[in-house]
Amino acid sequence: MPGRADDDLKQFLARVALPPGWRVLHEPSVVSTNDIAREAARRGWPDRSVFVADYQTRGRGRHGRTWLCPPLAGLLMSVLLRRRDAPAYTYTMLAAVALSESIERLLALQPTIKWPNDVVVDGRKVAGVLAEASDDGREQTIVVGVGVNVNLDEAELAELPNATSLSIEAGVPVHRGELLALMLERFDSWLGGDRFTREEGLWRAWNGRLWGMDQRVRVQEGDDLLVATVLGGERDGTLLVRLDDGTVRRVIAGELLP
């Protein structure tokens, strides 16, 4: 894919100005950036530490699914947040909104958020986000993992028919560093202010980008496959849908199917 060889994250990070208080560690290859972030948390790394890799040998998504991406083709990162008292799903929302805003600003695309944790362009998955919380009795630590298909071509996504990449959708190679810098700027903005104002605004922004809103979709909930109309997301990250008989149902865990 043209553009990968020139996309040197380490050099970019050496000269870019990050928001105050943020620090980024870049590695060429890791098992998983989430694993690196969790270990860093145990070692006392500070709030707003970011771990980025050019390649992951065992990246994970929701339900332990493997996230594979060719070297230099994706933005693979984890954000360590400390002393956070909001539920983990708040930070899944935050990452999805921040990424969507960054893609829109950088490439003029119109990404939407597919419940519970995907970012899609024209209905095709371009990224996954997942926040995990841990509590040692003194503070809650959040690790937010983000995986973005940046410069993959159609052949590399052939076995994933509902996936796409930013370069495919934009029609040009995309610089991972520029996307990362925008994401951290948006992360920083959403983390500011008082908790109520932040979470209310975040919920509205997340709902405003929700894929399938007011449309009939298929919902996989455990062993049940529902056909329902999406009414919106709740502040706790659950999804409200209306069944064909008019019943409103709250989906706590599940997946929207194409």
For each predicted feature, which ranges?
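N-terminal lobe of the biotin/lipoate ligase/transferase fold
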Residues: 1-105, 127
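Short loop/edge segments at beta-strand edges and connector loops
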Residues: 28, 113-115
